[in-house]
């Protein structure tokens, strides 16, 4: 199968985030996103974009990108540089499903409605950046997911 034909036959999924201090909740989001299609693209916030939102990443973009690329659910990592790039990404990568955490419900509906399926996934209970680091619950599953 040619790469061009494969692009059109595969169900393509995209998600966005900073994925700084990667934890089990992130791994679960990526696993569930991958289950929704054949090819998962992660748009990773650049250091500059994070700074524009008033956030400073603990790990650099390149370090976070390397960690995400090591996760078996992730097929491609691309930079997220602006809020408005989502529409362009949908077209450029032939996206079928846009996936993000349910804390963003409604935020991107107007921008993406009719262009692709929009899926808001619930947060993993008791896990997340808000609960602090390190997140120990489910650590073995997270470690296993890092091995391709």
Regions picked out by a protein language model, each given a short descriptive name:
Residues 2-148:
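Nucleotidyltransferase catalytic core that binds NTPs
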């Amino acid at each position: 199968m040619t790469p061009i034909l494969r692009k059109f036959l595969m169900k393509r999924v995209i998600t966005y985030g900073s994925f700084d201090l990667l934890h089990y909740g992130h791994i679960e989001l990526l696993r569930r996103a991958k289950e929704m299609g054949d090819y998962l693209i992660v748009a990773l916030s650049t250091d500059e974009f994070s700074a524009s939102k008033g956030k400073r990443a603990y790990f650099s973009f390149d370090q976070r990108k390397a960690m995400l690329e090591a996760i078996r659910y992730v097929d491609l990592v691309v930079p997220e540089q602006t809020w408005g790039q989502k529409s362009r990404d949908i077209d450029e990568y032939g996206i079928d499903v846009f996936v993000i955490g349910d804390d963003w419900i409604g935020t991107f509906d107007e921008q993406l409605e009719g262009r692709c399926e929009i899926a808001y996934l619930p947060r993993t209970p008791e896990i997340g950046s808000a609960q602090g680091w390190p997140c120990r619950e489910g650590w073995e599953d997270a470690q296993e997911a890092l091995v391709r």
